[in-house]
Amino acid sequence: MKKILIAITFIVSLLSGILWLRHSRLEKRDSEARKALMEVYELETAYKAMFSHYTDNIYAIVYIQDTLVTEGGNANYLVSLDEATDSTFKATAVSVVDFDGDGQFSQWQVNETGNIIEIVED
């Protein structure tokens, strides 16, 4: 009986460790998307201060996309400016990797308020 309890305790500890590692990896990827979108938000805010409107041209705000993992780099997210007006903008970070193999690709979005939300969960 004692050996069974030790085995069960070991298995539970092992599973807890696996779940913690998975959660830790997901948090790291999520923070990558949030960091990239916060940079876009700051660049768009500076652009608007200079030109009195937002832009949908990612090169105009001088955002430099890190090299994607699909191209031999380390970035898991492709950032794009989806729309912009005088008073609003929307930017998206879409994962280029299906992290859990379910066919869904993580998508995060930021707007002119700086509010970053996950719009598609992977």
Each model region followed by its residue ranges:
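Positively charged n-region of N-terminal signal peptides that target proteins for export
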Residues: 1-4
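Hydrophobic membrane-insertion alpha-helices, especially the h-region
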Residues: 6-17
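Conserved hydrophobic/amphipathic alpha-helical signal-anchor segments
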Residues: 15-65
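Periplasmic/extracellular, small/polar-rich flexible segments of pilin-like filament-forming proteins
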Residues: 49-122
